[in-house]
Amino acid sequence: MASKDYIFKMMAASSHSSDVREEHDFYSTEPKAVEDLLRYVDLQHKVTEPSCGNGNIANVLLSHGHEVDAYDLIDRGFGYTKDFLSDNTQIEGDIVMNRPYKYAMEHVSHGMSILKEGGKLCAFLKVQFLESQKRKPLFDAYPLKYMYVFRKRTNSYRNDDRSLGGSAVCYCWYVWEKGYTGEPTIRWID
């Protein structure tokens, strides 16, 4: 008989996980996922990463010549400490983030509110972020421009612990552009 963990993963029922969540929702981004984003999205020179964790996103951006303002609510040894949600300073350039899961909507909404016109916000999120009546006002206020879905699963690691293996979660890059008013375009990352 298959284990409970195996069955849930096969059903893609990640919301039924019996794993303990990381206290501050730190799930690091695979650097390859950021490389993939940069193949499709032309970012401005200056990029803010407001949930930098251990620097996986920022390091890829730096290696591509971007000037990166990287910070996090929790000091994880990279960037500096700052509370993104309580800072209303207008952002110069673009934002790239893998925000704490439980505050995803708040991070996207706040980021869009402090971006300059034409600035992009790229958020590494679950595909299921599209669902929910609760997020409808966010998508109404800030129409999504692009959604880049990974054809092959990419991972987000609790506390950057890669020994925990993969998951059945489907992630993608959501890309908003301040001032965009059209319909979203879905593209795939091979």
Name each model-derived stretch.
Residues 1-190:
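Class I S-adenosyl-L-methionine-dependent methyltransferase catalytic core
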